Amino acid sequence: MPTYNQLVRFGRKSKTRKTKSPALESNPFKSGVCLVVKTVTPKKPNSALRKIATVRLSNKRTVNAYIPGEKHSVKEHDRVLVRGGQVPDLPGVKYHIVLGAYDIAGVKGRKQGRSRYGAPSKQVAVTKK
């Protein structure tokens, strides 16, 4: 408990919140260039080969970004769009690649949750007579 004199001299400082995706610099998305595409294994107790890419963002920062969905078309030197979002069982992966943006195709054959995976709608276009 501070004394009255300490409050007069220093005041109360509000705590600053630490962002979970600092490389985005308060932006919802950042574009970047893919440097390396690789697979990594998750923490215990999970087991898989998760696909990640090392991306150099437009602000010159390098981050590891997760590639969601089954199969992907991410290659080295592709232009990608990166959003925030951690992968719970991959330490150090705090970003996701947005599928269906720039050089990256969406997941083919996706019926549900299509917007997350950049999959197009299966609705037939109405033709005018």
From Swiss-Prot:
Keywords: Methylation, Ribonucleoprotein, Ribosomal protein, RNA-binding, rRNA-binding, tRNA-binding. PROSITE patterns: RIBOSOMAL_S12 (PS00055). Pfam families: Ribosom_S12_S23 (PF00164). Part of the 30S ribosomal subunit. Contacts proteins S8 and S17. May interact with IF1 in the 30S initiation complex. NCBIfam families: rpsL_bact (TIGR00981). With S4 and S5 plays an important role in translational accuracy. Residues 10-20 have a biased composition (Basic residues). GO terms for molecular function: rRNA binding; structural constituent of ribosome; tRNA binding. One of its GO terms (biological process) is translation. It comes from Rickettsia canadensis (strain McKiel). The keyword tRNA-binding applies. This is Small ribosomal subunit protein uS12. Belongs to the universal ribosomal protein uS12 family.
